C-alpha cells in the first residue's frame, strides 16, 4: 500500500504538467488571419517556456515502483478518465487565455472594418432659440391650469347671494333688515314663529289700515286737484296774452300788411307808417 501511494504521488506532478501542455496547445491551435507579429512572438515564447518546464519535470528522477500490479494501473486509468470527464463537462480556461481571445477579436475589427465617424451639421442661418422662449410654454401651461381651477371654483349660488346682498343696499334700513331675514331663511335658517292675535283685535287692525289708506288717497286727490287748477289758470292767462298781442303777419284779412304779387310783398307808404308806429309803441 505504501508503494502504491508513492507511485500516485510521483505520477501526479508529471500528469498535471502534461495536461497543462495539452490545454495550452489546444488553445493555441488555429491561428487567425488578422494576428499580428507581436502576438506570434508572444506565443512562441510561451511555448518555449512550457516545453522547458515539461523537460525539467521529466528529467527529475522518479521513484520506480518495485512491482507494478493491476491495482496501480486501474487507479491511474480511473484518475485520467475522471480528469477527461471534468474537462469535457466544464473546461476551466486559464487566466491568460481570455486576454488572448479578446486580443484576437479586437485586431480583425481594426484591420477589416473601420468605425463610422458621426458628423453633426450646424447651419449658421438657423438662429438658436433663447431659453426664455423655451420656458414660456411651461408658464403658459401653468396659467391655463390656474384659469381652469378658477372656472371650476365658480359657483352660481355664491354669485346669486352676492347679487342679492348688493341689491339690499339700495333700500332703507327698515327694509334691509326684512330682506336680510328673508335671505337667511333662503339659506336654511328657521323662520320666526307666527304671532297669534285675537279675532276681534285683528278686525280692528284691518279697519284702521283701511281708514289710513282712504285718508292718504283723499289727501293725494286734493293735492292733484289743487295742482290742476293752478295749471288751468296759467294756461288761460297765456292764451289771453297771445290773443291781445298784435301780429304783423297774421292770418286775418284786416291785419294783413301790403299785397303779394308774383311772390313778392309790396308795401304802401301807409303800411310802412303802421309798422313804424307798432315798433315805437313796444
From Swiss-Prot:
It comes from Rattus norvegicus. The gene is Fsaf1. GO terms for biological process: ribosomal small subunit biogenesis. It comes from the Eukaryota. Residues 27-98, 121-143, 208-254 are annotated as: Disordered. Part of the small subunit (SSU) processome, composed of more than 70 proteins and the RNA chaperone small nucleolar RNA (snoRNA) U3. GO terms for cellular component: chromosome; nucleolus; small-subunit processome. This is 40S small subunit processome assembly factor 1. It is found in: Chromosome; Nucleus, Nucleolus. The modification Phosphoserine is found at residues 67, 75, 268. The modification N6-acetyllysine is found at residue 173. Residues 48-59, 131-143, 208-226 have a biased composition (Basic and acidic residues). Part of the small subunit (SSU) processome, first precursor of the small eukaryotic ribosomal subunit. During the assembly of the SSU processome in the nucleolus, many ribosome biogenesis factors, an RNA chaperone and ribosomal proteins associate with the nascent pre-rRNA and work in concert to generate RNA folding, modifications, rearrangements and cleavage as well as targeted degradation of pre-ribosomal RNA by the RNA exosome. Prevents helicase DHX37 to be recruited before post-A1 state. Residues 89-98 have a biased composition (Low complexity). Keywords: Acetylation, Chromosome, Nucleus, Phosphoprotein. Coiled coil: none annotated. InterPro entries: FSAF1-like, SSU_Processome_Comp.
Amino acid at each position: 500500500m505504501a508503494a502504491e501511494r508513492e507511485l500516485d504521488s510521483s505520477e501526479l506532478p508529471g500528469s498535471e504538467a502534461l495536461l497543462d501542455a495539452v490545454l495550452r496547445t489546444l488553445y493555441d491551435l488555429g491561428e487567425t488571419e488578422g494576428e499580428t507579429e507581436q502576438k506570434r512572438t508572444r506565443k512562441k515564447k510561451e511555448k518555449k517556456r512550457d516545453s522547458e518546464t515539461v523537460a525539467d519535470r521529466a528529467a527529475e528522477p522518479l521513484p520506480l515502483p518495485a512491482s507494478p500490479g493491476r491495482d496501480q494501473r486501474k487507479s491511474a486509468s480511473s484518475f485520467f478518465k475522471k480528469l477527461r470527464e471534468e474537462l469535457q463537462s466544464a473546461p476551466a480556461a486559464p487566466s491568460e487565455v481570455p486576454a488572448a481571445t479578446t486580443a484576437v477579436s479586437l485586431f480583425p475589427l481594426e484591420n477589416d472594418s473601420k468605425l463610422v465617424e458621426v458628423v453633426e451639421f450646424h447651419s449658421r442661418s438657423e438662429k438658436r432659440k433663447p431659453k426664455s422662449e423655451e420656458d414660456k410654454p411651461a408658464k403658459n401651461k401653468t396659467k391655463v391650469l390656474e384659469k381652469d381651477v378658477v372656472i371650476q371654483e365658480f359657483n352660481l349660488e355664491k354669485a346669486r347671494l352676492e347679487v342679492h346682498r348688493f341689491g339690499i343696499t339700495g333700500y332703507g334700513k327698515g327694509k334691509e333688515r326684512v330682506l336680510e331675514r328673508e335671505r337667511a331663511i333662503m339659506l336654511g335658517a328657521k323662520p320666526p314663529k307666527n304671532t297669534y292675535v285675537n279675532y276681534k283685535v285683528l278686525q280692528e287692525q284691518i279697519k284702521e289700515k283701511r281708514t289710513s289708506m282712504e285718508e292718504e288717497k283723499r289727501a293725494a286727490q286734493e293735492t292733484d286737484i289743487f295742482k290742476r287748477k293752478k295749471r288751468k289758470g296759467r294756461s288761460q292767462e297765456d292764451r289771453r296774452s297771445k290773443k291781445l298781442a298784435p301780429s304783423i303777419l297774421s292770418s286775418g284779412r284786416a291785419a294783413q300788411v301790403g299785397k303779394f304779387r308774383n311772390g313778392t310783398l309790396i308795401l304802401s307808404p301807409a303800411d310802412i307808417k303802421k309798422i313804424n308806429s307798432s315798433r315805437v309803441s313796444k
